[in-house]
Regions:
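Long, low-complexity intrinsically disordered regions enriched in Ser/Thr/Pro/Gly
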Residues: 1-481
């Protein structure tokens, strides 16, 4: 891989444009747009994050014994985002209750949204790229602002501001978990008709945690909060299709949910060591995958070489050691007396084609499990195909969005880790390979990674800095596109 120089950022606010031609970065109260092929600056804006008049009035009237904070951090950008066509971009300051919008083609054009008395928790683009969703404080409402008409549409009482909502894959419908008169309901809104309410129907949940719409757009999965391990499948018409609750209830609810890219399966796991897989025909469990403390010889087991970073001085790459025979996996024993024990499924993610499911368990923080799933024409026998054992806890792992068998992970050090099944031997046979790649930078511990939409580049982020990584040979293709 080729690595770029290190650049500043704040709050991990770095994002590729949907076409992967630009990189948007927030540095305190400034926005910077760079070309992704040369990293040269093409646009910069100094964002006005000063509170709105309403926010200032409320702040001046608020009576509190605590001293007011005048820290400049309170005026920093907290959210950024690209419109779907990369023409517009937003920068929000939740503390100030303002959202600023800019045009990549016209540096002089700008728009500003003042959240008002209800405050601002989160702002993001709608799929149409011309509407912005603003979530208020205290779960009061969601406001959809249209850049085309300049009007606002209000939806009252969302259950959560950071979850519990989704768009259908085609962007036509907006689904939102709401609470009215102490009852939880699901709202379906038509985005093509100014977010007009299509229907409301009651939810079977007592305290909904979140929801996820299937890739086909026909079903929505809704699950309970930490008091109960229960998941429901509903149609967008409001019909309850199925429900699932293991017996006995392992407690603390569901942590991770992931739809198969085709919508054929739904994978989810809680605070125990099990992953349940439901199929979309009967909505019944077809397989339960469990964390294995001892992995058999039939599984490819890869271990990070000891001391490789010091031996290579953080430059170049080195293959993982492939272990022979069955191996024990380092698994910690969680403290179940604590409110949030370090246990259970912390991440589930399917690859592009749905032939692999990546899973990470919090009580096995150094391990990545890769399960292989058959295609529609093969017999259904999912199995643990590969295990990656790292020297340090894995912070994040992400599948390549365009290639089926390409995974990248980071562990908070000056390295990234890759797994791929795309290697070809001298005999022309395909095989898998795991590698550790040093990042040639003295002050960049990779704590977060983001793929470019075209799958040819990576953003590697530390607390207040980032760099890009591109595969050797892919950069020329990127420039030609």
């Amino acid at each position: 891989m080729d690595f770029t120089e290190i650049y500043k950022q704040s709050a991990s606010l770095v994002a590729f444009s949907p076409g992967a031609h630009f990189i948007l970065t927030a540095v305190q109260d400034r926005l910077v747009v760079r070309r992704s092929d040369t990293l040269t600056v093409t646009r910069t804006w100094s964002v006005d994050t000063s509170p709105s008049a309403t926010q200032n009035a409320l702040s001046s009237k608020a009576k509190t014994n605590a001293p007011s904070s005048s820290s400049p951090v309170n005026t920093w950008i907290t959210h950024i985002g690209w419109a779907c066509d990369s023409e517009y971009l937003l920068a929000a300051c939740a503390r100030g209750g303002v959202v600023n919008v800019f045009n990549i083609r016209d540096e002089e054009w700008s728009a500003r949204i003042d959240a008002g008395a209800e405050g601002l928790v989160k702002a993001e683009w709608a799929p149409d790229g011309r509407s912005i969703l603003c979530f208020s404080e205290w779960g009061l409402r969601v406001t959809i602002w249209s850049l085309v008409s300049g009007t606002a549409t209000y939806i009252q009482f969302p259950v959560h501001a950071d979850r519990g909502y989704a768009f259908r894959a085609d962007g036509r419908y907006f689904v939102l978990a709401e609470r009215h008169k102490s009852k939880e309901i699901l709202g379906l809104y038509d985005t093509g008709d100014s977010y007009k309410l299509v229907r409301h129907f009651p939810l079977p949940t007592g305290s909904v945690s979140s929801l996820s719409v299937s890739p086909t757009g026909n079903h929505v999965a809704v699950w309970e909060g930490p008091l109960e391990y229960k998941l429901y499948i509903l149609t967008l018409a409001g019909d309850l299709v199925a429900s699932f609750a293991p017996d006995p209830d392992p407690g603390l609810g569901i942590r991770s949910v992931a739809w198969h890219p085709s919508g054929m399966f739904l994978a989810f796991g809680g605070w125990d060591e099990k992953i349940h897989i439901l199929d979309s025909l009967s909505w019944s469990p077809v397989v339960v995958l469990e964390l294995q403390r001892r992995v058999s010889a039939g599984t490819a087991i890869w271990r990070e070489p000891t001391g490789w970073f010091e031996a290579t001085q953080g430059r170049g790459f080195l293959s993982f050691e492939r272990m022979q025979g069955s191996q024990s996996i380092p698994v910690s024993r969680p403290d179940l007396t604590k409110a949030h024990p370090k246990n259970g499924v912390v991440q589930l993610q399917w690859n592009k084609s749905g032939t692999y499911l990546m899973a990470r368990f919090e009580n096995a923080p150094n391990v990545i499990n890769i399960y292989s799933f058959p295609t529609a024409t093969e017999s259904f026998v999912p199995r643990l195909s590969s295990v990656l054992i790292h020297s340090n806890p894995v912070l994040q792992a992400q599948w390549n969005p365009t290639r089926e068998g390409n995974l990248v992970a980071c562990c908070g050090n000056r390295a990234i880790y890759t797994w791929s099944d795309e290697w070809v031997t001298e005999n022309g046979e395909e095989e898998e390979m795991a590698e550790c790649i040093g990042v040639p930078a003295r002050k960049l511990d990779v704590k977060e990674i983001k793929w470019a939409p075209d799958g040819k580049g990576l953003l590697l982020m530390d607390k207040d800095a980032f760099c890009c990584a591109f595969e050797v040979g892919a950069e020329d293709d990127k420039a030609e596109s």
